[in-house]
Amino acid sequence: MHEKYKKQLLILTGMSGAGKTVAAHSLEDVGYFVVDNLPPELLGNFWDLMNTSEDFEKVAVVIDLRVKSFYKDLIDEINSLEDSGQTQATIVFLEASDDTLVARYKETRRLPPLAENGRLLDGIRDERRILTPVRNRSNYILDTSKMTTKELKQKLQSKFGELHKPKFGIEVMSFGFKYGMPIDADIVMDVRFLPNPFYIPELRPFTGLDKRVFNYVMDKDETKVFYGKLLDLLLTAIPGYIDEGKEKLTIAIGCTGGQHRSVSIAQQLARDLSEKYPVDITHREISRYLRK
């Protein structure tokens, strides 16, 4: 990227079906403000607008053959922008082999922009020919034929994400099944099989935040065995979630009402996981049981 300019402009372009949508999301994840499908003739006005704001230091624009007169207008607009001294654009061009693009289009049941009468290969070849001038002008050319989505994301983020590294965090949530499962949970553990303080009259009014309830749940032999295995499982799985680029992992622990067992387990889990990761804890049902 060009360090002399305060704001960075990246133009993401290339063959339809080569992975521009994945690439755009990947750039958003490392701090870029991304605009999709911008007509080339608006590039100059768009950049003027970006320069009026202090909020956007890294900007990416996706431009491809969904807009007409692409090959001519885009190069002209980039040249005009650079000649004015406002910025030095970095052009990233994504491509893939004909066979790969045909396979991807068949999988999605869509057609390339220039395919007429459903002729996939002709449309792909016409697009490749029209985009040649832009490809020749590009700073980076990525062939995604043999890349997985994860590999493309990692390659782009390692190249253009040096100013911003996504932070990983965990939310541990207790809840009650009787009030519905949390729809945003990544991992749900059902602890309704553990001994229930609800049936101990002197513990029933309290929650897992109370030391007596917590100790009752956590000191049971079956809880110790289960919890040890749960913690081992999560410590094994979490690095995989991080490698996949996940920024927030929500672990939900559920019991019947979200009062005793799930709260106790969630408390201990948050405490242990916080030794390695940033952790927030939420007790979804706790307000139902706090003594007024």
Swiss-Prot record:
Binding site for ATP: G14, M15, S16, G17, A18, G19, K20, T21
Molecular function via GO: ATP binding; GTP binding
Alphabetical keyword list: ATP-binding, GTP-binding, Nucleotide-binding
Residue numbers binding GTP: D64, L65, R66, V67
Superkingdom of the source species: Bacteria
Alphabetical list of Gene3D superfamilies matching this protein: P-loop containing nucleotide triphosphate hydrolases (3.40.50.300)
Pfam family, any one: RapZ-like_N
Annotated HAMAP family: RapZ_like
Known function: Displays ATPase and GTPase activities.
Family annotation (PANTHER family): RNASE ADAPTER PROTEIN RAPZ (PTHR30448:SF0)
Sequence similarity: Belongs to the RapZ-like family.
Name this polypeptide is given: Nucleotide-binding protein Ldb0621
